[in-house]
């Protein structure tokens, strides 16, 4: 799935190959999907990002630098990768269409593993984050967990945000809470539990773990914000509308403007731009810590030599 045109996507695959993996017919597979992740990682040369766990694992595997998505929208990008079919083929260009409406006999990646004797499990955001597109019983050995999370208490921690209304409240949050307060920490804990369960089973497994950060809102425990000096966060050099580009190229973007602290006209101040970028990096470091937990559990269970680990972002953020 490669495009010859520029796309707003970053895909990072890390695959750990060992002799024991290559010598076996059915190694385990751990697939980690990270929502809205661009190449803001040390292993991709980002001088700001603090991502020691992913960077360490990348040194043991393969980092792809030319992997592109088919469309820079969550649902079509994820479904295109998981089916091996273009968005135009599965006729999914939005967040609400199920790919089986156009291709009922399509075989997804987890479905393929399931059909060959694997335990196929899903925790977090994999196919999509809610509604019909996130449901596909054919792909999984048991129902997905935490695939559709709408509870504000799992998205926010500060009381001023919990008192708000609607799904979108503040666009970022730095709170003195543990990693386990937000949904991604819960997904990591549940994934670790399921890893132990799968390790005790004689069948190989395909475990898909989907983290929601660094997707908006940029909410992460304060300790990850504190890893960065706010004044050192770079903001875009050019914030104006590109000359001769169509209006729809930059307007309207409800993804960001739907949050309560973002002007409806989309005019972001330099201070707010720096805050948002700070929050994005904090979320990346938060996810790096959770990925580190998963890898540590693989090692503790002595599964790392017989497990292929794949980590990717569905598309980037700009």
What do these predicted ranges mean?
Residues 2-4, 21-318:
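Formylglycine-dependent sulfatase
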Residues 7-17:
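Bacterial N-terminal signal peptides
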């Amino acid at each position: 799935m490669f495009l010859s045109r520029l796309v707003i996507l970053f895909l990072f695959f890390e695959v750990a190959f060992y002799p024991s993996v290559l010598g076996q017919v059915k190694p385990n597979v751990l697939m980690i999907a990270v929502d809205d992740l661009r190449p803001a990682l040390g292993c991709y040369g980002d001088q700001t990002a603090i991502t020691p766990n992913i960077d360490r694992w990348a040194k043991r595997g393969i980092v792809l630098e030319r992997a592109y998505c088919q469309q820079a929208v969550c649902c079509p990008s994820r479904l295109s990768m998981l089916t091996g079919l273009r968005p135009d083929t599965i006729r999914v260009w939005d967040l609400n269409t199920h790919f089986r409406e156009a291709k009922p006999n399509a075989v997804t990646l987890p479905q393929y593993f399931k059909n060959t004797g694997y335990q196929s499990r899903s925790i977090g955001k994999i196919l999509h984050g809610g509604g019909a597109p996130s449901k596909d019983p054919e792909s999984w050995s048991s129902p997905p967990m935490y695939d559709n999370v709408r509870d504000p208490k799992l998205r926010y921690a500060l009381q001023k945000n919990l008192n708000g209304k609607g799904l979108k409240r503040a666009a970022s949050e730095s709170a003195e809470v543990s990693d386990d307060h937000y949904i991604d920490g819960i997904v990591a804990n549940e994934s670790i539990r399921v890893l132990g369960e799968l390790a005790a089973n004689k069948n190989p497994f395909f475990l898909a773990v989907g983290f929601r950060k660094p997707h908006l809102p940029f909410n992460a425990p304060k300790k990850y914000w504190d890893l960065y000096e706010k004044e050192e966060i770079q903001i875009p050099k050019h914030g104006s509308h590109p000359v001769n580009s169509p209006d729809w190229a930059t307007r309207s973007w409800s993804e960001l403007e739907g949050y309560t602290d973002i002007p409806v006209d989309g005019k972001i101040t330099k201070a707010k731009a720096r805050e948002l970028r700070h929050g994005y990096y904090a979320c990346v470091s938060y996810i790096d810590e959770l990925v580190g937990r998963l890898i540590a559990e693989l090692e503790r269970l002595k599964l790392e030599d017989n497990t292929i680990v794949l980590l990717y972002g569905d598309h980037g953020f700009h």
